[in-house]
């Protein structure tokens, strides 16, 4: 499978690359023709920071963000995204004028939950959800 892999580079920054593997992949709800591996993008500091810069440019001038909820292990990107949005002067309604970066926990049924101590980061906030996994 690795020999079929190729990289797709962002036109905005060559540091941002996703590995793509063509094939037939089955999930419980869909069939897909390409697997997009974002492991290094979400784990390497320089790639995560570059990806965050690109993402921030889409939100910086027109979208208030109080909290970033990170799914699928993208907390590194989320932290850099919060930093980039803060640098750009994005509107944030939090008392400390900083963006929360958090991840939900899972209960025994696999449902995402926020415990009482982290609910203040999401309830009534302008939330940006950052995920590295989507499917049809």
Question: Where do the protein language model's features map onto the residues?
Answer:
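PRPP-associated nucleotide enzymes
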Residues: 1-136
């Amino acid at each position: 499978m690795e020999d079929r892999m190729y990289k797709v580079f962002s036109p905005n920054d060559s540091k941002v690359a996703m590995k793509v593997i063509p094939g037939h992949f089955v999930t419980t709800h869909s069939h897909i023709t390409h697997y997009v591996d974002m492991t290094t993008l979400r784990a390497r500091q320089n790639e995560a920071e570059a990806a965050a810069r690109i993402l921030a440019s889409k939100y910086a001038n027109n979208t208030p963000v109080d909290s970033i909820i990170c799914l699928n292990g993208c907390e590194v990107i989320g932290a850099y995204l919060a930093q980039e949005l803060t640098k750009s002067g994005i509107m944030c309604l939090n008392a400390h004028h900083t963006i929360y970066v958090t991840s939900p926990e899972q209960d025994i049924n696999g449902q995402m939950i926020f415990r009482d101590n982290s609910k203040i980061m999401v309830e009534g906030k302008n939330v940006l959800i950052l995920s590295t996994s989507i499917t049809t």
